[in-house]
Amino acid sequence: MPRGGMDDHWPSSDDQGHDPKEPEQLRKLFIGGLSFETTDDSLREHFEQWGKLTDCVVMRDPQTKRSRGFGFVTYSCVEEVDASMSARPHKVDGRVVEPKRAVSREDSARPGAHLTVKKIFVGGIKEDTEEYHLRDYSESYGKIETIEVMEDRQSGKKRGFAFVTFDDHDTVDKIVVQKYHTINGHNCEVKKALSKQEMQTASAQRGRGGGGSNFMGRGGNYGGGDGGNFGRGGGGGFGNRGGYGGGGGRGGGGYGGGGDGYNGFGGDGGNYGGGPGYGGRGYGGSPGYGNQGGGYGGGGGGYDGYNESGNFGGGNYNDFGNYGGQQQSNYGPMKGGSFSGRSSGGSGSGPYGGGYGSGGGGGGGGSYGGRRF
């Protein structure tokens, strides 16, 4: 297929010729806001100042060959990516551009994947995990502003999750793009922390993409169909009424549940994390956050139940850390492809994923307890 075609935008999972510890997704930057005069050569000339580029492309309309206003550069190692991001702001052909770490195909389908935020949600916090464990881990990615370990106001017991706010959105992008996180010896989920308003924005943006052009393939349709379902249709999706991850979710609210979950800010249950608490009776399955019975991504729903079997790779997120079962899938955006359903160079909120560059911050509100450090 010619350079810049639709299907060659996605790398192979083995990422041949490079250290497997540094998959292509981690070495790739999305460059938004390009001048329509910018070419592959002028883009390369600028960004190769910070390292060796293994690929560089300005995305163009396949019919008119006109620039879509964005492109991608891929470095030979993550260290070069970090150096490039540390050199912001970047100006190419007289225009200030916006570099962001590329988002994988599966992550692009998740709420807020392209929103710009400085706060992360950390799930799976165990009772023996203290603030300094979170700080030690998070400081390796960037400068921390605050850490909030969420607790039950009455008992003082940890709720099982925390929030970390950094001074730079790129630190958040860097940490969430990685698939595995182990804090104080425990497997943890790390994702962007979105306010209720940001969740609504993300849902609306995915809804505009709608239909069969989204990333989840058959039946996924986040933001469209039945109430913005993040999963295979039906009730109980992300932000719907039953648990966190799709058709069989439990917990009467759960993470993101109807009115009393993570983005319910107090709601009916009055707790930040839903009536039975974060991971209560079914954060993606029956009991608990990652217990072997259902677990994170367990059968029948789970987190990101967007393939036909209704789970992410068929594996549990349990103490053995088999997140997604066998191996990571696509390593992230390559040349070409439709990022926001109907078009990849769309107007309004941005050309990439229909939502890059929006908003900031997250969390807040709700009748929960927490210690801020």
From Swiss-Prot:
Listed InterPro entries: hnRNPA1/3_RRM2, Nucleotide-bd_a/b_plait_sf, RBD_domain_sf, RRM_dom
Keywords for this protein: Nucleus, Repeat, Ribonucleoprotein, RNA-binding
Molecular function as annotated in GO: mRNA 3'-UTR binding
Region (Disordered): 1-25, 196-218, 319-373
SUPFAM superfamilies per the UniProt record, alphabetical: RNA-binding domain, RBD (SSF54928)
Subcellular location: Nucleus
One Gene Ontology cellular component: catalytic step 2 spliceosome
Cited Pfam families: RRM_1 (PF00076)
Domain named RRM: residues: 27-110, 118-206
Biological process per Gene Ontology, one example term: mRNA splicing, via spliceosome
Organism: Xenopus laevis (African clawed frog)
Composition-biased stretches (Low complexity): 319-333
Protein known as: Heterogeneous nuclear ribonucleoprotein A3 homolog 1
Stretch forming the signal peptide: none
Compositional bias ranges of the Gly residues kind: 207-218, 334-373
